[in-house]
Every structure is written in C-alpha cells, then in structure tokens.
C-alpha cells in the first residue's frame, strides 16, 4: 500500500495502476473540465524530469504522462476508444507506425475543452476511435463552443 500513499491526490492514487483511469471518468460522463483539472494537477505535481509518482512500473507511469499531454486516454483498454480530455501542450506531431501523421492542436485557454474536432469535423461524443487516430489527421481542442 505504500505505492498508493506515494502521491497524495486523495482517492485518486495515481501511483497505483488500478487508479490511473480515475481522472478520465469525469470526462467519460461528460465533465471534461473536471478531468482536465485533475490531469493537469497530476502532471504538474506528480511529474518532473527526475520523478514519477510511485515507481515507473515498466513504462506505465510514462505512458500515463504521454496520454495526459496528448489529451486522450484508454479508460477501457481493448475497446478501441480513447476518452477525450484536454491536450496539455500547444502543438504535438505524432509520426505513427504506418507513416501517417497525427497533429494535435491545443487552442484552449488552459481550463478545459468545450469542443474537439478531428479533421475539421466536430466530435459529438466524449471519445475518439483508435482506428480514426491511426489514419492520421488533425485533432483540435477548442475552448469556445
């Protein structure tokens, strides 16, 4: 249980893998703003160039960090869907294994995303399909509705 106490974020024991999805459950039920606040706090307070919350656990803490910065997370691994959050960088370019490019653009004011689009089409759901991202394109987070 020492792993759960290593990072004090209340019931969200981010240093323990069974809790890594908890901030994104807010987004899954439609409250992206609350998810964004938790994720940003964890990124800011739990990570730096020398520290992970808890131990690295064969890449799981690094993977959580990367998803937190990208703005989406696999709440239900294997489902083929990522729950949307908020991108925590201004612009990201990901070169996919297929050679396709995924551009992620953050146009939010830093609080939350009220609108997300993929290749110019608004995303009405609170998730995006893995297959869609793997084809490449532009995922854009906006503050305005």
Regions found by a protein language model. Give the residues of each.
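C-terminal beta-sandwich/jelly-roll accessory domains of carbohydrate-active enzymes
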Residues: 101, 108-145
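Active-site core of glycosidic bond-cleaving carbohydrate-active enzymes
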Residues: 1-101, 131-138
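A short, compositionally biased
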Residues: 85-91, 106-114
């Amino acid at each position: 249980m020492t792993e759960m106490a290593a990072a004090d974020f209340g019931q969200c024991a981010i240093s323990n893998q069974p809790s890594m999805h908890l901030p994104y459950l807010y987004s899954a039920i439609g409250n992206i703003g609350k998810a964004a606040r938790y994720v940003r706090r964890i990124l800011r307070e739990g990570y730096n160039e020398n520290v992970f919350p808890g131990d690295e656990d064969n890449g799981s803490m690094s993977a959580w960090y990367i998803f937190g910065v990208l703005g989406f997370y696999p709440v239900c691994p294997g489902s083929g869907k990522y729950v949307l959050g908020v991108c925590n960088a201004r612009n990201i370019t990901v070169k996919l294994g297929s050679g396709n490019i995924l551009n992620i653009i953050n146009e939010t004011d830093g609080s939350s995303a009220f609108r997300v689009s993929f290749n110019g089409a608004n995303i009405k759901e609170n998730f995006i399909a893995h297959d869609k991202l793997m084809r490449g394109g532009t995922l854009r987070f906006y503050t305005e509705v």
